[in-house]
A protein has these predicted regions:
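Membrane-interfacial helix-loop segments of redox and metal-homeostasis proteins
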Residues: 1-152
């Protein structure tokens, strides 16, 4: 039970890390409440503005960070429900959903990393924060089903 709660808290923590990065992008590039250059580092490679304003920054006309906000919000909600829910069958289902979402999210993150490195030729630090959060969620989910399978 203790291991399960620790994994749930870690899932919530990384969910908020990713959500925070996506909201920062929203505030910077859509709502213009934060300077767009605030996450650009004087470098030929690290430049959020070039990544977020590139031709690859949307899917079906929607900026990728909106999908990130939705993704991390769902992960957080499922994890909070798991944390307070006492029904094992439902908790197992929520854990499976989080694992499935994490696998999907990791696949999308791999695609976006490819886009940043090989198509745009720039890296966005905030996007990278989101990618790290997604891969951390995947590792936590895998641990939940392997090492701590008795505490799902």
């Amino acid at each position: 039970m203790k291991n399960r709660k620790i994994l749930d808290y870690l899932t919530i923590l990384f969910g908020f890390l990713g959500l925070g990065a996506m909201i920062y992008l929203l505030l910077s590039f859509t709502l213009n409440l934060i300077s767009k250059n605030s996450c650009d580092i004087i470098s030929s490679v690290i430049n959020c503005t070039k990544v977020v304003t590139s031709n690859y920054s949307t899917l079906f006309g929607i900026d990728w960070y909106y999908y990130g906000i939705g993704f991390f919000s769902v992960i957080i909600v499922l994890s909070v429900i798991r944390l307070f829910n006492k029904k094992e069958k439902q908790n197992r289902l929520f854990a499976q959903l989080i694992l499935a979402l994490s696998i999907f999210g990791a696949g999308v993150a791999c695609y976006l990393i490819y886009v940043e490195l090989f198509l745009v030729h720039h890296i966005c630090i905030l996007c990278t924060t989101g990618h790290i959060a997604i891969f951390s969620l995947l590792i936590i989910s895998i641990l939940r089903f392997t090492k701590f399978k008795d505490t799902i």
